[in-house]
Every structure is written in C-alpha cells, then in structure tokens.
Amino acid sequence: MFSSHLEAEKQCLLNCIEAIRKSGSVAPARYFLTTTTTTSEAGKTYYYARLVKEESVGKQTVRSLGRIGSGQHRAWERSIARRDAIVELEQQLKLLDELMQRQQERSHLVDRDFSEPEKD
C-alpha cells in the first residue's frame, strides 16, 4: 500500500503535463536554438536566431528563424520551453513511481504493531 498523498501528487503531475501539451506545440527532442551575428559594411551588427537539429553524432541541420525576437523565433522558444517542462515533470513522475513501488514492496516493514507488549 502506498500513500494517498503520493497518488494525488502523481495525478497532479499528469494533469500538469496534459495542460502543457494542450497549451501549444511541443518541440521534438534534439532541437535547440542558437544565435549568429552578421556585421554590415557600415559596422552595424545584426543578430539572427537559428534552429538546430542534431541528426547524429557530429551532424546537425540548421534552419534560420530570422531576427531574434521574430514570430518564428518566439514560437520555437515557447515550444522548446514546453518540451523542457514536460521532460522535467516526467522525470519527477518516474521518481514518484519508483517511490510508490518501493512503498508497496516494503509495506510489510511498516504496517505492523510497534507498541510494547502490556505488562501484567
């Protein structure tokens, strides 16, 4: 038997994950953002956002998202933030499941009478 508080926490984590998924698109794994700069002949520096996908070890696909702060850039920032939040919540969920399993397996150690026997 495990704590009802743990079961409630598990449900809370699952609800949070579901809410994040419903709030918008979630970036796939191995996608991240980088920035690059370009300097014009007049000396003005422009900053651009790039979306990078790691294909395999050492291989990357790069796609320009326009200037930093552009609509595409902000959309990917939010998408990656949602992914990172889901990954964190899933890790917490895994730890919680392990704790619940441990409680279930070791309940015989805790669910017994520890009181002193009555003296006559």
Segments predicted by a language model, with ranges:
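Conserved glycine(s) in the ABC-transporter nucleotide-binding domain "signature"
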Residues: 1-120
